[in-house]
């Protein structure tokens, strides 16, 4: 992508392949990709949507502190919840299995907090959004659960599942943004970038 002279370079505060792919879909290629290592532990009684917003902001600010040049920093955090119960970012086979069992046959909500910061001449302009998608999985058999867990694609994923992978076959119902479930709501991303003066359609 050729940058318009009026466009600042994009810095993505994530190494998520899904988020990189989603930006590429709207013809945005980040000039830098920086993983923001932060503590993602929910606060006591913290609700899913505020958690997603807080973590996205923390990621963006962390990356802002690491760069000197003017840029637009995009950060996001995805949280999966059943009611008020926040499911973990699964790190083991057992965590994936527990998450999938909870999601089986139930509606759940996927929240992605989006924080985009325009850093220009040491001035910061912060925009924050939250996107929500309702997803319902069909009732899964033990065989289906065990097979999915054996794929390892739920490792390091919020709620222990990768919607753009095999788990897509489990979706009985979805209401809302599919890109949000993948980790970056494109509608909100484009609108926010535009509000900051970034020419998305150039």
Swiss-Prot record:
Instruction: Report the subcellular localization.
Output: Cytoplasm
An example GO BP is: nucleotide metabolic process
Name this polypeptide is given: Nucleoside triphosphate pyrophosphatase
The protein's organism comes out as Rickettsia canadensis (strain McKiel)
Q: What is its EC number?
A: 3.6.1.9
Q: Which Gene3D superfamilies match?
A: 3.90.950.10
Molecular function (GO) terms for this protein are: nucleoside triphosphate diphosphatase activity
Q: Which domain of life is it from?
A: Bacteria
Q: Which PANTHER family match?
A: BIFUNCTIONAL DTTP/UTP PYROPHOSPHATASE/METHYLTRANSFERASE PROTEIN-RELATED (PTHR43213), BIFUNCTIONAL DTTP_UTP PYROPHOSPHATASE_METHYLTRANSFERASE PROTEIN-RELATED (PTHR43213:SF5)
Q: Write down the CDD domains for this protein, in alphabetical order.
A: Maf
Listed under GO cellular component are: cytoplasm
Output the Pfam families linked to this UniProt entry: Maf
As for what it does, the entry says: Nucleoside triphosphate pyrophosphatase. May have a dual role in cell division arrest and in preventing the incorporation of modified nucleotides into cellular nucleic acids.
Co-factor(s): a divalent metal cation
> What does UniProt list as catalytic?
77 (proton acceptor)
Q: Which reaction does it catalyse?
A: a ribonucleoside 5'-triphosphate + H2O = a ribonucleoside 5'-phosphate + diphosphate + H(+); a 2'-deoxyribonucleoside 5'-triphosphate + H2O = a 2'-deoxyribonucleoside 5'-phosphate + diphosphate + H(+)
Q: Does the keyword Cytoplasm apply?
A: yes
Subcellular location, principal: cytoplasm
């Amino acid at each position: 992508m050729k940058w318009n002279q009026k466009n600042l370079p994009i810095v993505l505060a994530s190494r998520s392949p899904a988020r990189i792919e989603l930006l590429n879909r709207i013809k945005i290629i980040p000039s830098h990709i920086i993983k923001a290592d932060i503590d993602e532990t929910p606060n006591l009684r913290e609700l899913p949507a505020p958690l997603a917003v807080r973590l996205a902001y923390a990621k963006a600010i962390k990356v802002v502190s690491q760069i000197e040049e003017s840029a637009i920093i995009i950060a996001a955090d995805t949280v999966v919840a059943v009611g008020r119960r926040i499911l973990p970012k699964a790190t083991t086979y057992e965590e994936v299995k527990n998450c999938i069992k909870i999601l089986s046959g139930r509606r759940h909500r996927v929240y992605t907090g989006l924080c985009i910061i325009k850093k220009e001449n040491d001035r910061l302009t912060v925009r924050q959004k939250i996107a929500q998608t309702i997803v319902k999985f069909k009732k899964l058999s033990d065989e289906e659960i065990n097979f999915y867990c054996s794929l390892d694609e739920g490792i390091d994923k919020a709620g222990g599942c990768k919607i753009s992978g095999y788990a897509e076959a489990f979706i009985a119902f979805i209401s809302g943004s599919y890109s949000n479930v993948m980790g970056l709501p494109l509608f909100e991303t484009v609108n926010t970038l535009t509000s900051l003066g970034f020419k998305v359609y150039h």
